């Protein structure tokens, strides 16, 4: 029997942004559990125009790749700020602090992370990019 899971990221996965005080400027749908991922994490995220995630974060074990689906913005990686746009893929190694910001039209992106890590892998720093 084939082993697979199909979920719609917009309708089948809850927006967790309100739980973390990020709404209404941020939409964040973490699909790892809904997809029954064994070795990776996946999220769908949307930033309103000129909105920034309210914290920076880094992981002790997990590497992440962000893919911009639409819009544009900027990403801060430690002390380096880069402009990013549609179809850009950004790999961020563990131990690199990161934060994203939507451009004038906002930004929608998917984030992939591996390996799948237990709670506590991320260090969250509120207001890191201010």
What positions do the PLM features span?
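A generic "binding-loop/recognition-motif" signal
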Residues: 61, 80, 96, 105-106
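Short histidine-centered beta-strand/loop micro-motifs
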Residues: 32-34, 54-59, 101-102, 127
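Short, charged/polar surface micro-motifs in flexible loops or helix N-caps
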Residues: 37-40, 48-53, 72, 81, ...
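Short, conserved beta-strand element in jelly-roll/cupin
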Residues: 44-48, 58-76
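Histidine-centered metal-chelating micro-motifs
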Residues: 52-53, 74, 90, 94-99
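A short, N-terminal "cap"/entry segment at the start of jelly-roll beta-barrel domains
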Residues: 1-39, 49, 121-130
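Double-stranded beta-helix
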Residues: 4, 99-130
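Short acidic-glycine-tyrosine-enriched beta hairpin
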Residues: 79-95
């Amino acid at each position: 029997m084939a082993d697979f899971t199909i979920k719609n990221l917009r309708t089948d996965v809850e927006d967790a942004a309100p739980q973390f005080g990020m709404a209404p400027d941020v939409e964040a749908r973490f699909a790892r559990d809904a997809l029954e991922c064994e070795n990776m994490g996946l999220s769908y995220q949307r930033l309103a125009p000129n909105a920034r995630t309210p914290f920076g974060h880094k992981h002790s074990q997990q590497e992440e790749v962000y893919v911009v689906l639409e819009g544009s913005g900027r990403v801060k990686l430690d002390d380096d700020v880069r402009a990013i746009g549609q179809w850009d893929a950004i790999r961020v190694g563990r131990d690199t602090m990161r934060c994203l910001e939507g451009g004038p039209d906002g930004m929608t992106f998917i984030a992939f992370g591996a390996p799948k890590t237990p709670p506590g892998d991320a260090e969250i720093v509120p207001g890191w990019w201010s």
